[in-house]
UniProtKB/Swiss-Prot annotation:
Keywords: ATP-binding, Cytoplasm, Disulfide bond, Nucleotide-binding, RNA-binding, Transferase, tRNA processing, tRNA-binding
Region (Interaction with tRNA): 155-157, 317-318
Active site positions: C107, C205
Protein name: tRNA-specific 2-thiouridylase MnmA
Keyword tRNA-binding: yes
Gene from which the chain derives: mnmA
GO cellular component terms attached to this protein's record: cytoplasm
Record's function text: Catalyzes the 2-thiolation of uridine at the wobble position (U34) of tRNA, leading to the formation of s(2)U34.
Location(s), subcellular: Cytoplasm
């Protein structure tokens, strides 16, 4: 097991305790390294806080049980107002504009590594914070700090953390980033932690498991419209463009069409002006493919970013294979990205995250697609 910053032994670390196995093992590993460890549990959602939807109470119970087992303090904090103002309203605005946002990325930026870090600094006098994310940090001889992909390729979460600043990365520790997921569970089981076999959380950051269309419909009125083929034939109805994303295959309700082949139907475009969902057959339909994209709202971990003309790789969604590409800066905040080969289902509103080998450089928001 790789050691974590032995030169900082004795420093105070506040661990974001979620009630899951990754944060539980993070706290244990840091204690083993000699850090002074305390936990902090965040509650960030108030609406619909009931047994059906919200597991916050159960998560807090598990976090407390782990901290009791490890013999460390557990603090609690409510960031619901910050979450609503800085994450959820952005999430709704993007969907209303017809884009597909990634709330987990904004949640990390505004809550886990901003509000949390501020609280750990101002109230708990922390030297570092730590999270159970599968990423790594590297401190270089020149004083710079880089964020690296996690050792477990299947669990690497650097895509969700590209908005972190150099300063935030330098103040953060990521113990499980050096491990495979199965190793984390094995450590938790060996230590008798209640979370060792707890299911990984999915769904919207901090909002949890719920029916997405029903949940979104509580905040944005649905606007049903036509489903058309790429050739303009009306073949069905959709319940709202905000519920659909490029490349989507399931839930379209248009199977068994006459005069069509057996290839599955995919969302290939969204016509916002006409409120029309455009579909085509086959996962490599021409309307689904892009030769490149324009990316704005750029953020680079090292503040500088890659050089003009750099040939690096990009991910346009989580767990995607690396896409080789070439970069051209159109201005300080807009990047033209040309793929080596056409790519399917690149989605405006999602994040494009760039890598040089194992180093996460940063990224931005996909604004426009380059086709043809």
């Amino acid at each position: 097991m790789t050691s974590i910053e032995p030169t900082h032994t004795g420093k105070k670390v506040i661990v974001g305790m979620s009630g899951g196995v990754d944060s539980s093992v993070s706290a244990y590993l840091l204690m083993q390294q000699g850090y002074q460890v305390e936990g902090l549990f965040m509650k960030n959602w108030e609406e619909d806080d009931n047994d059906e939807y919200c597991a916050a109470a159960e998560d807090l119970k598990d976090a407390q049980a782990v901290c009791d087992k490890l013999g460390i303090k557990l603090h609690t904090v409510n960031f619901a107002a910050e979450y609503w103002d800085n994450v959820f309203e952005y999430f709704l605005a993007e969907y209303k504009a017809g884009r597909t946002p990634n709330p987990d990325i904004m949640c990390n930026k505004e809550i886990k590594f901003k509000a949390f870090l501020d609280f750990a600094d101002d109230i708990l006098d922390a030297d570092y914070i730590a999270m159970g994310h599968y990423v790594r940090r590297r401190d270089n001889a020149d004083g710079t700090t880089q964020m690296l992909r996690g050792v477990d390729n299947n669990k690497d979460q650097s895509y969700f953390l590209y908005t972190l600043s150099h300063e935030q990365v330098a103040r953060s520790l990521f113990p499980v980033g050096e491990l495979e997921k199965h190793e984390v569970r094995e450590i938790a089981k060996k230590m008798g932690l209640i979370t060792h076999d707890k299911k990984d959380s999915t769904g919207i950051c901090f909002i949890g498991e719920r029916k997405f269309t029903e949940f979104l419909g509580n905040y944005l009125p649905a606007q049903p419209g036509n489903i058309e083929t790429a050739e303009g034939e009306i073949i069905g109805k959709h319940q709202g463009l905000m519920y659909q994303t490029l490349g989507q295959r399931k839930g379209l309700g248009i199977g068994g069409m006459k005069n069509s082949n057996d290839d599955p139907w995919y969302v290939v475009d969204k016509d916002l002006k006409r409120n029309v969902l455009v579909v085509g057959q086959g996962g490599h339909h021409p309307r689904l493919m892009s030769n490149g994209m324009l990316v704005n709202q750029l953020h680079w971990v090292d503040r500088k970013g890659p050089a003009e003309g750099s040939q690096i790789v990009v991910k346009t969604r989580y767990r995607q294979q690396d896409i080789p590409c070439t970069l051209t800066y159109l201005d300080d905040n807009t990047l033209k990205v040309v793929f080596d080969e056409p790519v399917a289902a690149v989605t405006p509103g999602q994040s494009a995250v760039f890598y040089d080998g194992e180093v996460c450089l940063g990224g931005g928001i996909i604004d426009q697609l380059i086709r043809g």
